[in-house]
Amino acid sequence: MKTNTDLFEKVPVPKAVATMAIPTMISMLVVVIYNMADTFFIGQTQDPLQVAAVSLATPVFMIFMALGNLFGIGGSSAISRALGEKHKERAWHISSFCCYGALGLGVIVAIFSVFGMEVILRLIGASENTIGFARKYLLIISIGAPTILFSTAFANILRGEGAARESMVGNLLGTIVNIVLDPVMILILGWGVTGAALATIIGNIAACLFYLQYFLRKKSTLTISLKYFKIGGGIARGVVAIGIPASLNNILMSFANIVLNQALVGYGDTPVAAMGVAMKSNMLVVLLQIGLCVGIQPLIGYNYGAGNKKRLMQIFKFTGIVSVVMGTILTLLMMAARKTLVQVFINDAQVIAYGIQMVIALQLSAPFLGILFLCINTIQGMGKAIPSLVLTVCRQGLIFIPLIFILNHMFGLEGVIYAQPAADYLSIVVAILICTHLFRNMEHRNASVEE
């Protein structure tokens, strides 16, 4: 598409970043609302145990989304580089592979999750008080896993070809359906967590149908035709090489949340509910910064594939400045509204007290968190699988999880609460070091070519 080619190659950097990032940020804002909806309406039941159950189940839902990102982020990176290299048919093979790969893995995940439900419930730290609610919620989410993987994957695939607006519309449609159904199913029909899960899956089905019609009406330069499905020729390897680090990041994040919840359970169900509410509130800050950085990944990938290193660096620097400014503004807003944000979800005195402290703790690293996501998405956009994997493992595996145990042992509940911002700052340092190394290598290669 000529318009998308101009966007990647010629449009001024601020406008190109805005064109790609704003729809993605709106999509992430939609994800924030989407994730808050279940907790908000469950909170209106004034039952902390149901709120805690949904909080405990959230990491499993995030793992399903992470597996969708295996094909979504991996496919988006591979597609944008293929288009930058003018290999259009290769991009078709990639999009078809991602379509059927996401659906196939979704079916496998659904089967294993349903039959392994009791094991999962114990792993996420469900107590005798919350296990019944968590089981009801997760059973429906597990059955709907194929729709979660597909909608997550193709929200990213569309961005890979520059169709950020269409990606946003699909996300928005799914969220609107979820939000409309939540109060009906949770409160009016009195289905509680079961209603929340059903609304979530129906919302995902709506998003899937939108993405399918986008391809079937041939609005895309890509295809999901089965005749272009291909695993060999580096297609699967190219997607998985970037997709695994990207999905591993979210899987480790979910696993870290499980470890965090297990540490909090030692202090009762109330801190678990409070942390769930605090993290939902903090999603506004985190996901808007992720949206900015995910939005520019196709620009990075295309210009890296096209060999335009100067434009790549301009995009990186401009996005870095925007992320810090935006992160600072969002942090100030969160600090000012911290009590209101917690009360919106549930009006329980103990949950509110813990929740306010947790919101404050999570804001300590928020102004600079965008730098971490910028480095991650730049590395993924460049197709650097090993550095991406290293950074991913460092962030959630080697830093956050050990800090939970260490700080819990040293400072008790206070230590658990402040483990996240401490891990964030250490991760930012590692990310900057890795990106600096890659940029220096890129400059050396350019100098060698010129000589």
Regions found by a protein language model. Give the residues of each.
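N-terminal transmembrane alpha-helices
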Residues: 8-40, 44-45, 59-74, 78, ...
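Transmembrane helical elements of multi-pass membrane transporters/channels
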Residues: 19-38, 140, 174, 203-207, ...
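Residue-level hotspots within pore-lining transmembrane alpha-helices
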Residues: 30, 34, 64-68, 108, ...
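Short runs within selected transmembrane alpha-helices of multi-pass transporters and secretion channels
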Residues: 141-159, 167-175, 196-209, 290-293, ...
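Alpha-helical transmembrane segments of multipass membrane proteins
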Residues: 36-40, 111, 119, 153-157, ...
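Short alpha-helical transmembrane segments in multi-pass integral membrane proteins
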Residues: 1-21, 79-146, 188-244, 300-365, ...
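Small-residue-rich hydrophobic transmembrane alpha-helices
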Residues: 51-111, 148-167, 274-332, 336, ...
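Helix-terminus/linker motif at the lipid-water interface of multi-pass membrane proteins
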Residues: 29, 33-51, 121-128, 184-191, ...
